[in-house]
Amino acid sequence: METGPSITPRSMKQLSQIYLLLLLITGLTGCTTIGYYTQAITGHFGLMTRAEPVPKVIGNAETPADIRDKLALALEARQFAREQLALPVEDAFLEYVQLERPWVVVNLVAVPEFSLEPHRWCYPFVGCQAYRGYFSLEDAREEQARFRANGYDTFIGGVTAYSTLGWFDDPLHSGFTRLSEDRMVALMFHELAHRVVYIAEDTTFNESFATSVELEGLRQWLSQRGEADRFDEALARLQRRNQTLDLVRAATSGLEALYQQSDSLAEDTLRARKQAILSRLAEDYRELSETWTEPGPFGPAPVTLNNANLALFRQYNQFVPGFRQLLADHGNDFPAFYRAVEELGQQPPDQRTAALERLSQRFEENL
């Protein structure tokens, strides 16, 4: 007789944490708010109940060989992250979940029609963020429809992985194993980095920091395995991201200047000029990506862009050079780097932004 997934002691520990969170959210007001947190918690618990220990999956003769190989590599990467990168691995990535879709959650971003300031949702513990994650695409689309009805630009994007910041033992899943070996390992380092430092309401800081750990971690990982030349592929992806960011900065500069005229220009004029800027950006991206060997940050051209795409993209990529310079300033000593990042994170937002801008100006590749 076929039985369902067993509840392991690790799952029981996490289940007790979920019950605690359920008790906490009952103090929140509004049916929509409670419904949102309920889907988030039950969605994560759904992953946990389907998770199996990685060694068991590796030892199962019915597991495809490529999955076994990726999971064995993931165990090595966990050890490397703990011993060489000083990351707080704990019990993360010790279980595996096979998903029926390429993403684990989807994020919704909503931005007013004539603004680049996204709507912000506020959450317990992590503060306010410019996106809202859903385990159900249907739920995300329902919320998207509400914003569209109020004239917002919106974007829904699939997310390969997310971090619970150490609250739970995050599992591996098929979103990881679908990636190439290097990208899977890099993503593991990235998600573990969020456990080190996380500044509430500063997505740019958090994501730039995690990407810097991801990049240097991957460089050291490949070097240890005698595959240092493969780091060039990661740098090429970073270069594509930076080239796209340059285009986005130019477009957002034009849009910001346009939106400042919202009180003096007719809406039809604003829409026409906005669309001209976005169309130019899409065309510039198409031309830029023609020689790339894989899709860029916005995916394969042609692309349709709006305020929400731009607001999300520029949040994630701004200060990677600054954090990489800070790491180099500390001799690639990760514990010292983490302490410096924690100190930086305690500064007022404008001061830490200025510090990262100064660091970014000093950065040169291959230090």
What are these regions (language model features)?
Residues 1-11, 222:
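N-terminal amphipathic/basic-hydrophobic helices that include classical n-h-c signal peptides
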Residues 9-19:
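Bacterial N-terminal signal peptides that target proteins for export
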Residues 29-30:
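C-terminal motif of bacterial Sec signal peptides marking the signal peptidase cleavage site
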Residues 33-40, 47-55, 175, 182, ...:
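Metalloprotease/metallohydrolase-associated module, dominated by Zn2+-dependent proteases
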Residues 44-81:
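Amphipathic alpha-helical packing elements
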Residues 48-63, 121-129, 303-305, 321:
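Acidic/histidine-rich, surface-exposed loop or edge segments in extracytoplasmic proteins
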Residues 77-241, 253:
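Acidic/His-rich structured neighborhood in mature extracellular/periplasmic domains
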Residues 249-367:
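Pan-zinc metallopeptidase signature
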